[in-house]
Amino acid sequence: SNDGFKKISWEDAYGTLTDKIKSTNPDKIGCITGDLTNMETLFSVKELFNKILNCKNLDSRPVKTYVNNSSRTNYIFNTQISNIEKSDFILLVGTNPRHEATILNSRIRKSYLKNNMEIYSLNDVGDLTYPYKVISSNTDELKKIILNEHEVSKKIISAKNPIVIFGQSALKLNSSGYLFEGMKKFLSENNKINDDWNALNVLSNNASTVGAYDLDILDNETIDNVLSNQFELVFLFGQDNLNIKKKNEFIVYIGTHGDRGAEMADLILPSAAYTEQDGYYTNLEGNLQLAFKASYPPGEAKEDWEIVNEVSKKLKGKSLYTNKQELIDNLLNYLNQKTKKNGETVKNDFIKEEIFVDKIDYYFTNVIARSSKTMAECRNLKLVSLKTGTDG
């Protein structure tokens, strides 16, 4: 209602939600998962949608970016962070690693100091703590590199262990498919992608990105339809970075903080934060890792998978899983059986455009950081130092 939210019981919340699901055509239901969502949640949501709702409208991206998930090598950091020190040449494409991946950036700095390696960037991204050469940020320049018509092409070919890093800003471009696939082809043809060394890397910004792609939570039509208000019922699982103007759709927010997703929701189901539940995540390099909880969820908040399980029970009379271990077993089984498949065939046209690197609000990068007093203080100090010119 316009005057805020009304407190209801879990039973009423499930009742409201299941009534809404039953009265909505599955084609008109969509879901976007969040940037801190663990893999148990991602998998249970996928199973709920695919098996119970008979619906495939799932995505994990708040904006459309180019992803070819026919092979993991298209969306992970293939070179591995520990191998950066073996590199003798780096090309940054639409990324500011100092803000997007600080540990990775410190490795690049260490490698520069140790090997005096050359670093190039398509765009001036400010102080990275090491010198780098700036190439024009137009996609034309990258096209020339890919076609072996640029000095950087020669440097990549002559380098023993080159590294090319695509940031998320580059993958948002209209011609990102052309540029990414073109670079992959160029590196392959010059034997820079082989059993010992893979020079092609993608730098994902969020903890849940790689795991979501591994679980195929990716659908260009879904994100288009959410952003253009085509769905009647939208689930946001910890998703607070969507830039949409709400119209008539019914929005269900399952999350932890009263942030952007909750503000436009019609129904809020409180869940545990990532610090309040054990959960699997797949990191930048594609390794599965288990994060242990540091505390318990407040009040009546539940773990996300429990909410999904309960919704399934209310709809079909039976739960998806008898316990969390069964869910984890099913999840690991899915990952083990996953084979290479054909990615969505996207027409990869070249378009001349500027490669901008998105400015990251460093201390406010996610919903939990945005609600932290400490992070707010750090951010304010940074803003003050920028205004006074005392920022290094």
Task: Give residue ranges: language-model regions.
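Residue-level signal for alpha-helical context at structural boundaries
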Residues: 67, 126, 286, 326-330
